[in-house]
């Protein structure tokens, strides 16, 4: 058991997805959110952040709303950090159907000498599959109050540990390499369903 919390950001309906809730898109018979919950099962606590908590009753998890709604993923992370019981929280977006248990467990077991542990994949930081220290919530709140809600910009206000290598990644199924892929548009989702791979 990983003595950290995990939070799934299920912000709601996306305009680029024709206002469908991406958490309830299906891939291989499971909702995206079901696949993510399974990947996070070794974390001591799993919560969901959503402004529509009634939609998630079937999963038996605690659901919390944004404290500062309408300000994007930074608001969701801030809410998660205010509600978790542990000192660290893995944050995952609900539109990442290939989140892999080995990858998130590897992140969860890295020594806690950081405020933010953030993967870098294909030259891009991945703040929506990253671990945040609970104490980050105070600076995040100041940013939200000032309507300065850019997530990456806010991340640079903290001591970040960047993870660029996953030692096991070449030895396992290629789905691990897709871990950070997210589905944003109707076309991307239709392509996913047609090809069954990315």
Curated annotation (Swiss-Prot):
Function in brief: Transfers a GMP moiety from GTP to Mo-molybdopterin (Mo-MPT) cofactor (Moco or molybdenum cofactor) to form Mo-molybdopterin guanine dinucleotide (Mo-MGD) cofactor.
Compartments, record wording: Cytoplasm
Domain of life: Bacteria
Pfam families in the record: NTP_transf_3
Comment block on domains: The N-terminal domain determines nucleotide recognition and specific binding, while the C-terminal domain determines the specific binding to the target protein.
Residues at which GTP binds: 9-11, 22, 66, 95
EC number: 2.7.7.77
Binding positions (Mg(2+)): 95
GO MF annotation terms: GTP binding; metal ion binding; molybdenum cofactor guanylyltransferase activity
Protein name: Probable molybdenum cofactor guanylyltransferase
HAMAP family: MobA (MF_00316)
UniProt entry tagged with the keyword Chloroplast: no
Enzyme class: transferase
């Amino acid at each position: 058991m990983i003595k950290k919390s995990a939070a799934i950001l299920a912000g709601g309906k996306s305009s680029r997805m024709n206002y469908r809730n991406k958490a309830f898109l299906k891939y291989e018979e499971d909702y995206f959110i079901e696949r993510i919950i399974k990947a996070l099962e070794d974390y001591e606590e799993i919560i969901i952040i959503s402004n529509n908590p009634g939609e998630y009753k079937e999963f038996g998890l605690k659901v919390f709303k944004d404290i500062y709604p309408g300000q994007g993923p930074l608001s969701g992370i801030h809410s998660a950090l205010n509600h978790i019981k542990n000192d660290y929280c893995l944050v995952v977006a609900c539109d990442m159907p290939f989140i892999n248990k080995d990858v998130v467990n590897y992140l969860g077991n890295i020594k806690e000498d950081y405020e933010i542990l953030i993967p870098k994949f294909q030259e891009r930081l991945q703040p929506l599959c990253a671990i945040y220290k609970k104490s980050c919530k105070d600076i995040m709140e100041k940013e939200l109050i000032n309507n300065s809600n850019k997530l990456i910009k806010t991340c640079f206000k903290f001591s970040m540990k960047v993870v660029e290598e996953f030692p096991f990644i070449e030895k396992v199924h290629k789905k691990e390499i897709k871990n950070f892929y997210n589905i944003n548009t109707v076309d991307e989702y239709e392509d996913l369903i047609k090809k069954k791979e990315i």
